[in-house]
Amino acid sequence: MLYFSTRNSNEKVTASQAISHGLAPDGGLYVPESLPQLTLEDIKALGKENYKERALKIMKPFLDEFTEPELKTMIARAYGDNFDSDSAAPVHFLDDNTAVLELSLIHI
């Protein structure tokens, strides 16, 4: 996937170039040239994954120049042991069509 500046859509860069630059040379933000399409089933399946697996599936289409093992390593290093469990942001299903994402700073 390629990225372009919010101030100039003509010059495109790779994800690693966008990450390395931070901001585009013209001061704009880098945005993806397209957004991956997810089906309802894709979205429901994300709720059944642990946080790191969910992060991988969400990031992978945006960072397609990196291999899956590279992405897994980056995710593991980014999140490390900073959370009480692998479910850093657990999803609780209330029924087949309703889920709640738990975001908590303190676990008692």
Question: What are these regions, as identified by a protein language model?
Answer:
Residues 47-103:
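Glycine-rich, N-terminal phosphate-binding loop and its surrounding beta-alpha-beta segment
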Residues 106-108:
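Conserved small/polar residues in nucleotide/adenosyl-binding loops
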Residues 1-65:
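N-terminal, positively charged, Ser/Thr/Ala/Gly-biased leader segments
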